[in-house]
């Protein structure tokens, strides 16, 4: 699990516990019980776990407190606090449907074989206005076969995320994965939520055969890399697949050119450049990739100036558009973007992390050798995709010296790349 963004707040364990224990109506304007509950994920101690359980038992119905209780349950799940299981179990009957969702998820993270708890979770499928997807996923994760009959009707639910989870759960519980092609098909659905969540379902099922399809799915690179990365590591460790089988799909995904994707959007007529630039700010990255492809094919000469303008006006503060702008400059062969790319390469603000790998590859595309030491410095980062992208970039420059720095890297895919 990637935990590098867990600790944003300069709080000690004692400070976080003190804030969390403060009644909501006495909390200072500079303090937040929600932040305190979030921050305690960094302290897997008896004291922190006890404080989180106390927060759950504080049942003030005010919205601020309900949100804190939900977060406390989530944090206990992340800490895999077995001692908290009885307290979390009580939340399965909470009137707050979101609290129930978090409690089910947390029990799945902690794990249990208690048939009474598992039956309680299963019976939540009979409750109206509940988040069924998480319940179904958890029952499958905990391998609760008595839930098969309850889950089956959800395979035809009108909500694609729910039906996808149900189909996947039945495949896992029955040990029969013949229906997983239905989930693979969702990777090309026009509904972006269905596309994103189908990747998670493929991960949950360890469906390694879907790696090529995931690499072509038009969603944010973050979702694709998570799917390819987790499936690849699990498959290689299991001996079911080899690195050479997944390497081309992983590397095409890191390069992230729209030509390697199966796009789900199109235009009836050619839009003007201003419309396409605006599309780079869409939260549905499928639309962004269609816009990028159209810019490259139709506006190669005029696009660089427009991209610089949008960067100065908005994109430097919008992490999605920032990412796309960084990628577009080298594909447009726009060498004056060098300084912007160097800045993006070293930008450690959390929201711009995916732009760093994009900048490394972009700098190699531009081909200015001044970038070599700048890229090489990223090999010591704790971000696997940045390290992998840096290796690809250095290879393009003909520099393979970075491999020696990563001889004993913690990440399996980095080690496999080094040895390939």
From Swiss-Prot:
Domain of life according to the entry: Bacteria
Alphabetically list the UniProt keywords: Antenna complex, Phycobilisome
- Reply yes or no: does the keyword DNA-binding apply: no
Q: Which organism is it from?
A: Pseudanabaena tenuis (strain PCC 7409)
Tell me a Gene Ontology molecular-function term this record carries: oxidoreductase activity
Q: Which SUPFAM superfamilies match?
A: ARM repeat
Check the record and name the InterPro entries matching this protein: ARM-like, ARM-type_fold, PBS_lyase_HEAT
Give yes or no: UniProt keyword Transport: no
SMART domains given in the database record: EZ_HEAT
Q: What is this protein called?
A: Uncharacterized phycocyanin operon protein Y
